[in-house]
Amino acid sequence: MATLTETISKADKHDEKLTDFQYSKKIFNGVHEVEDDKQRTDFTTVRFGDVEKKFAVPKDYKYKNVLPTFPNAVYNLTGELAFEDKGLLADPKFSNLLKDVTKVEHLARDLGTVLYGIQLSKLNDAQKNELARYIAERGVVYFPDQEQTLEEFQELGQYYGHSHKHGSNSRPFEDKFAEFQVVYSDRFSPYDQHAKNNSLRYWHSDVSFEKQPSAQTFFKALTVPEQGGDTLFISGYAAYEALSTPLKKYLEGLTVVHSGKEQSEYHRRSGQHVRLDGDTNAHPIVRTHPVTGWKSLFISPGFTRYIPGIPRGESDAILDYLYQHIANLSQSTVRIKWTSNGVAAWDNRIVIHRATYDHLPQTRHLVRIAAQGEVPFFDANSHERSEDLRE
């Protein structure tokens, strides 16, 4: 078991009143530049094995054991994993899940809900099953003020199936939390200029390039900025339904190639250890959800590359159109404003998401756990969500 050692920097007293925004000088050539460390007291240097790194957190930071690292582990591709969707066991009226809810706040008509009064660590199996179905219908659900340890958060994610381990993104150093993906940034973090200049590229469904992309996904906020750092979600159900009938029919016969190679190479160029290279797989453009039976547009701009079987120019034109199409679905887009100890649960198969990249140099720290879902499929007998809602 690795141990953590830390030292705290000492600063000159006359510089102690610098704010984070004063400390952040400028953004230049994609790098978020910072002043000399001697001006600051509010950071800790943490050692993970032979690697030492600065973090803009206090010396007694509660979540030091889940700060981001790239340990020298090696992951291997596995065969197809069994997946039984817990939503298939759920009461479709959500009689167990909603009985203790004190307030239901829908963020949009068909996407996004905030549930108040529930503690995720107290859910029984019937409630967990209904949560799987609830996010299969609502896309993303937010739970504020969760009194939940990291171990309890991990147990919740593990309930839904084999927990995904990311091959290249940061994870905790300790193997006990190897299933967590760590999302962390602060004033020491590189700033990707593409986040401002090429926003469509940042919409994505997590690990859509894998043979079995993530299904039920849980994201826990540990430290949140005062402003910014929100997450936006778009409904794949709504994206499909907003297409013209001829285009729907055309797309239902096509697949699209998703690739994680570029993500792996980005980490490698950044000097970070890659545990498993991103895979490449073709998935249906129109996907059927196994619980709801609803059709969803399964496009992930961060990872989709081309449509096989048609000319590349035609493929590029179709994908460019679909990217613009989903980005313009303002009525089917919601924003999650993170609060400390809040948890978001979403169905990664039927929403895409992106961060807003507007919080730096403030610290943003979250951890994610997700179940690996089924191999994506299209069922010609599936139907649109709106058909059920009209009944």
Swiss-Prot record:
It is an enzyme of class 1 (oxidoreductase). GO terms for molecular function: 2-oxoglutarate-dependent dioxygenase activity; metal ion binding; sulfonate dioxygenase activity. Binds 1 Fe(2+) ion per subunit. Fe cation binds at residues 204, 206, 353. GO terms for cellular component: cytoplasm. InterPro entries: AtsK-like (IPR051323), TauD-like_sf (IPR042098), TauD/TfdA-like (IPR003819). One of its GO terms (biological process) is alkanesulfonate catabolic process. The keyword Iron applies. This is Putative alpha-ketoglutarate-dependent sulfonate dioxygenase.
